[in-house]
Amino acid sequence: MAEFNAMDTAAFKGVWVFCEQREGEIQSISYQLLSEGRKLANDLGVELCGVVMGSELNEDYVKALGGYGADRVYNIDSPLLKDYTTDGYAKALCDLIMDKKPEIMLIGATNLGRDLGPRCAARLHTGLTADCTHLDVDVEKYKNFLRTTSNIDVDNTKFEENTNLKMTRPAFGGHLMATIICPRFRPQMSTVRPGVMQMQAFDQAGADKVVIENVAPALTADDIHVQVLDIKKSAEKLVDLIGADVVVAVGRGISADPDKGIKLAEELAEALGGVVGASRAVTDEGWLSADHQVGQTGKTVHPRIYVALGISGAIQHVAGMQDSENIIAINKNENAPIFDVATYGIVGDLYKVVPELIKEIKAAKA
């Protein structure tokens, strides 16, 4: 077990990203976090390192992490890390952290990351902020963020000048946003949901020059108390909102006839080659499962086209889709806040408008 007090924090330098892989393939959340980590590392003037774990991973996959911003990649390789176990991964990662002492550690808020992050934070006796939607180390950039996302009188508020990681996340069911710091302990740890951070374009020059350090962990079978016997993929296919080019989302406006509203959304999504999303109101009612939810407490998406059907535009929902390239809003309330972020707006009854849209799209394709 390790414990670092305030006197030790100056010894910690660098931004690290845990790069998750499944069956040898690097997950997109890793590239998103490296892109965000690159910004933080630039602001701090430090190195950005990726950490990947597994057994005999493809060297090209490891080098590709440099193409998304990593200066250095620690490749922790062991047959005992072939399959994820909390004990094995936590020990290997914590041992490396205690040796190299990074000041920031970013982990994806995936099922794996939500298990690994808290275990590592507990071992290291440091803090972890979960499900972050915004990260800053530069005070001026943080002030600009507050100016655009809050009603705080930034210019008349005193801010402490430091480079602590300012970790912003939804609180109280998404009704508030809280910024959390960890000033006395290191590393400062944060988990970030997939789709929240923008992934930069791949840079081959970065991949060519990245430094790869192969690490043989001090790990034995006795360190791992759970044995993975078999891995079975879920029979249920979850909707891929984050990777979708088109999202057709439904809100409380379908309450008059939820089944019909969802059916129309599915037909429109099929016509456009997209998938169906939902506001929290829809998933709370059980009309669609939680994997369809878009927003602060759901998924953050950046599709080419986002169609909002009967969605009023609560700030919690808008936070999860406002960076879509084109937003088409259909709502019978002309004062609905969703029109403030919409590229195109249609004031009308979705049950009348959507069938006409579907008909026109199909005719155009014929």
Predicted regions mapped to residue ranges:
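N-terminal glycine-rich FAD/FM-binding segment characteristic of electron-transfer flavoproteins
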Residues: 1-366
